[in-house]
């Protein structure tokens, strides 16, 4: 547990580098006295050592000569880890600058420091020199100048008791009949009570049973489970554990089973003490929640034990108590559970101090009234030492210390009533009167209820009882447990409640208590009358104590406090009179430190003593403090044994103190020896402030305290029930967040239970008021405000009362788990460090921005690859020179002539059995059959367009070659999907109409699908509506077979088909949005692709090929239709339908037929991975598994695939990604590289500027892991070019990928668009590259890296291609370029309710829009800040609109890819079905609701998504 969050920040004016390494020996350092153990020394020794340490460690005159000091330089520090602090520079801390239009990009990306705009002028030694001799040394502990005696017998000194259990035995004998505890009900009536004799007897009985029957040893832990109303049973068991020598572990929360189990496990407790009623209730709770009883724990009902009866002439068992008394478990501000160990010695130290303070509290004449004047019904039997009245929980913290332990130590009578009793007007004051209370313990929440009830209706208090009038004259101390002193309220309590009700000195009676609830509830400051003030004040000054200065206050300058400086404008009465002045803050003091405590003000970041009048963390050392956390040694060392440092005036170096302190986590200061607390470290907000002075930009941090902000909100904002405020560290900046609880956020319901519309206008008004009031009163630029219903924010238990836990709220806010109904952002004011590009108007590709990059990288080489030409030479199988071949048809005739009986194709069925072998002769005959049939059709002529609609089969290959021979232009397309007819049919009709399709060739399976009733009706109706005449459908598989060969038919290729501009083949590519792209390839290109594929993959005729999925285009097409003919090898065909039924069949075929090179899509591999097949075959033969992709590769996805398949025998070197697109199926590949792909980490911040900069760590939020796409194959050359200026990019920047290759497509089919035509004959601006380049439209870069070519191979340099993504999908904000996929990945990782792949980011009308498919539609407002923060932190942009839609509403392709274009179109046209829309910046301009108002429409329901299993298998993979 570390109570200080790991956030950077500069603490006030003290900016120092923490001490690192060893500290040089120094004469001053040797003067420190070792004080490592607080519990093994006597109180006197501890006090003397503490004083000696203070006097020797801090030179004379250090405090007296101190002046208010301002440090002008500012530097940030952050907490790192739990045990130490260190300085963090660069990316972790500093803010990215605003880059002007003419920003110097060289400075921006210089080394590892990314745009720091915080500079330090002074050297570190000069900073230390400012502190030498000026630091404020710790306040010395005070002595108790008199012996502490028993209030009932002044002859008995309490120091003779060695433990608190011995004191109880003493009370049981000498105050036997006096009442020890009285428990009241909610109406103030006595519920139960117990005398000291019975209390001691029952405790002895519990101890006896534990000793005799439990089997526990000394120091074993025993759990105590009692409810607050069972306080007497709790006290009995607690002291029973003390007497028995075991360690008590109180547990106060029964509703949290996980917390109970954690405590039982941590403490290894085997025994639990409780009551019969409590045990039955606990059993019912477990049964209701279907939980099991904790294991290995025995449960005893102590209310059935009775009392202890000592035999005649027998002596009491000796007390052999261990060091530890009890372990108190509590939660830290961030919700972590930890136990604090309390020893018996610690208890006695604190009891002595508290007894001395109570003994010196002033008593008044009326306090000595004859008890006969009071109703004897209540006063008879009460202790004459004093009566203690409280409603705080007696089982923990200060309630346990004062209400139980100190009651036993001082012999008081404690009267306890439930917290609900304070809500009864007049009851509390009458209880104090009835019992003649000497001391009462309260908290602000209860005391405010009591006091304000009296203010509203005094008669309810004064007339509450007819027996006696209200009189608080006997009250000596009204103790209030609080963290901050409420100056205004303590005036009200003193002057308008205590004084009117008879208290003679109300200001002295009111005693704020500064306690440490996280550390056992120990008191570190409270009002006392012991003396020693002259040692607390500067120069020994002691002001006379009067009733007027019993309440100490100061009026501080608000602006100075923001810089952690204490500038006092007025004190005490003057402060009260001037508190209404603007820009001031009124702060009240607790009092001097606790009598035996050493207290220091320390800079929490540097651990160096602060200067006077500077806010710092309160560190304290005292014998009354706990020894540490239970079973957490590292946290104990960091928190309970912290060491501060002072600056030597000789060496100007930090000298560590040997005295150990407890870090309280409280921020405050000391003035005239009194302790002022501003709040917890976690409750302090900080915000960056920038301004320009004399042309120099300055940056500092203003600090604000949650308590001040909350008070302002509660006073000025209407309809706020409670609130929380904190800051979050996003984008290297602290951003204030406010969470409001408001009754307006309760979801209204009608009488029938139906929910009605929420008044979002009222919620918007409340949040607007909050933003404006904090800006006006505190100059806090709020980042966002969220609203939820009352009692929904996370709370912590303090004194039995639930209070909002700021750090728990922050954690829940960051995780998006709170039930918020509304969120309002004010990013325009709060976010300062949004980066701006070099050219904010024209973007990163402009001449100006490109010129800056060119100047920055002027010493780097240009990015283009080499070119190795590999033209056709000899056919390896036939040893025939094929350099003169111009078409695949010539190679086919070569196979028929030379190897007619060799097998060309074999079909594999679903069981892995071979079908009928197709030899080259039969193949030739089947192609001739289709040629002969088509020649008879008059409308089939060379140059005509035909569509090949086939399932994966050899019929498709026959038809393809028949088209080649006849000079037809084939366009292969898959069959129509009956599940997506609304998408497929329009695309098919578009193809027919715009490209004048003469015929559609199909096989039997495709024909059956077309003739299906649903499909045929849909097709005919759509054709009629679109006025499209359907062409002839020819079923080629049903043509009568004939035995003539192609040669015998005397079929000759038309010469026009050999023209380089003639499209021999047209590939149809559908984007995820189902946008059709047709690319044309001539015969020479097809041969070149085969040649490049053969050379790069080292393919031979000796190994067969396999065609299975995606056979209509790309690599799948070549492996299915062309490579077998080109190599003269056998091609095995596996139907995608059979693969879907048995995914392992693919690898069984590969293993059986020793296939060396094959391909698979990402969908194919993902399908296999999801099916989890067993009995994998041996895959050692597979050397090259090609995975085509047309964009950026997911490094995490590839790693997971690789890990899975390597586990099943596939070589990690076999994974070969292939970069391909519609213009070239084989642009780059990792085939046979002999190296495992290693992600390269790129800096996203540099990437936005167009630069490539490696990132040093994957833990950085801006680190982008990127995999390469391999090397450039033969006969191919790549260049990286600026897409706008057409200048070659240099190494260190990225640009558009241009390619020159014989495998490039010749054109977009029948396109006359000048832009399309320009893409196919691109040249750079200076002509360096020459002509013939094709622009891919993808962004990427080339980089030379060193890799080992396989295991035990030498390291070689490789030029690798990295693909970033399509340039058409990028968008620019402030002149910086962003890839939507990166932002979408960030969003999907940010919250578990965001579906994977369920995010779309795009730019519309200049606004960045985020559309999210959410899981569930409740409390979507809680997710919005998580999304905005994640985008801001990783990408430094702010989304303008966040819209939510139900899961399944995204249009998706048959491959389950989201269709960005359709989502954008539906958003622009208002047809996107959204459940809520949040405007972060700007308004909806009438399209939706007004600015910042969510659009909640519960009537909308998501449509069921189309499962990928329901589509045709060949379209899935």
Curated annotation (Swiss-Prot):
Coiled-coil intervals, chain numbering: none
Entry-listed glycosylation sites: 35, 40, 76, 917, 1178, 1321
Cited Pfam families: AMP-binding, AMP-dom_DIP2-like, Mug62
Alphabetical list of Gene3D superfamilies matching this protein: 3.30.300.30, N-terminal domain of ligase-like (3.40.50.12780)
Bilayer-crossing regions: 231-251, 397-417, 510-530, 612-632, 720-740, 956-976, 985-1005, 1051-1071, 1114-1134, 1261-1281, 1353-1373, 1408-1428
Region annotation Disordered: where it falls in the sequence: 1-26
GO cellular component: cell division site; membrane; mitotic spindle
Entry similarity comment: To S.pombe SpAC22F3.04.
Protein's name in the database: Uncharacterized protein C56F8.02
